[in-house]
Amino acid sequence: MTATVLLEVPFSARGDRIPDAVAELRTREPIRKVRTITGAEAWLVSSYALCTQVLEDRRFSMKETAAAGAPRLNALTVPPEVVNNMGNIADAGLRKAVMKAITPKAPGLEQFLRDTANSLLDNLITEGAPADLRNDFADPLATALHCKVLGIPQEDGPKLFRSLSIAFMSSADPIPAAKINWDRDIEYMAGILENPNITTGLMGELSRLRKDPAYSHVSDELFATIGVTFFGAGVISTGSFLTTALISLIQRPQLRNLLHEKPELIPAGVEELLRINLSFADGLPRLATADIQVGDVLVRKGELVLVLLEGANFDPEHFPNPGSIELDRPNPTSHLAFGRGQHFCPGSALGRRHAQIGIEALLKKMPGVDLAVPIDQLVWRTRFQRRIPERLPVLW
């Protein structure tokens, strides 16, 4: 008897086209055993129905994926307890304060985003084409936004950003540099909490709560961790999404022209760009804490399950004509780009506004934006938790 050869994930590092294997799996085997880069076996779910089942069932735990001996999607780049960061925040009684601080409705925040986007684009126009929309627009805009929301100096953003190229690696083996960067960034945020000049944003609020006797049970480590994780996860998610959204938009000149002519349609456009977004390179990992029936498979306690977002978001059973961007879908926000259930992304509203304002500013300044190289010449980062091109060269 020959052993079954397991499919290896991820299928592709490219964020501009969905692998053919996704549709085939969703049709034939919406739950299928695969092998991760660590050599561990996992169940890959690829239909909308099964993906939502796993994300909404609390017996599939994100926290337990970091447990000692658990099958791994990839090596941890943060301390194990940080995997359950939002759970730790809620347990400490800090969720309300954090959510209030990261709303895009904070006074002056949207104008700050517009001003920053316009300034970045003006610099690119002054320098002339070709311009790099990832390194000189999407990522700096995301970095500036999160410095503003955190209430930390803008000049500190690039230093913190440099940690992310290692923090979000997808490696089979431990990454020594990740701990070095983590310890340095924690030390930075601890210093921010002690800085009397930091009075605004999330860190200003955490600094006040840290001195409140009602929060004496919360460790300084957790207060600092909130700052580090919010910056890291927020910047990498918003920056990579805007980058891949711009690629999708450039590939669809009719949509680009429509959103330029009718900017009021940009929110609907962003929702569809979120749905077809391929920036999340690996399936969302969950560990079964009980035996659970998923489709035709009984997932056993202790087994790893991977939720394939592009499988769900391109499922024609839920989104007819899934490869087409349709601004009048009846269920526009039911995609899983921000997850689902207890780990739904807390920064979803902020991420939407970042993309909406960034795209609106770009189309005003560069209405004819186009790739400056053939799309197959884009170099996609490999072994990374996000699908991003190293550069996004454009002309206009």
UniProtKB/Swiss-Prot annotation:
Cofactor: heme
Enzyme class: oxidoreductase
Positions annotated to bind heme: 286, 343, 345
Activity regulation, per record: Inhibited by clotrimazole, econazole, ketoconazole, and miconazole.
Keywords, ordered alphabetically: Cytoplasm, Heme, Iron, Metal-binding, Monooxygenase, Oxidoreductase
Principal subcellular localisation of the protein: cytoplasm
Subcellular location: Cytoplasm
Annotated GO MF terms: carbon monoxide binding; cyclase activity; heme binding; iron ion binding; monooxygenase activity; oxidoreductase activity; oxidoreductase activity, acting on paired donors, with oxidation of a pair of donors resulting in the reduction of molecular oxygen to two molecules of water
Residues flagged as site, Important for the position of heme: 346
Site (Participates in a stacking interactions with the tyrosyl of cYY): 168, 182
PROSITE patterns associated with the record: CYTOCHROME_P450
Outcome of swapping residue 338 to H: No significant change
Pfam families cross-referenced by the UniProt entry: p450
Mutation effect (residue 279 to A): Has little effect
Binding annotation for substrate: 77, 85-86, 237, 301, 385
Note in the entry: Was identified as a high-confidence drug target.
Family indicated by similarity: Belongs to the cytochrome P450 family.
Matches recorded under PANTHER family: CYTOCHROME P450 YJIB-RELATED, P450, PUTATIVE (EUROFUNG)-RELATED
Function field: Catalyzes C-C bond formation between the carbons ortho to the phenolic hydroxyl of cyclo(L-tyr-L-tyr) (cYY) producing mycocyclosin. Can also use cyclo(L-Tyr-L-Phe) (cYF), cyclo(L-Tyr-L-Trp) (cYW) and cyclo(L-Tyr-L-3,4-dihydroxyphenylalanine) (cY-DOPA) as substrate.
Name under which the protein is recorded: Mycocyclosin synthase
Organism listed in the record: Mycobacterium tuberculosis (strain ATCC 25618 / H37Rv)
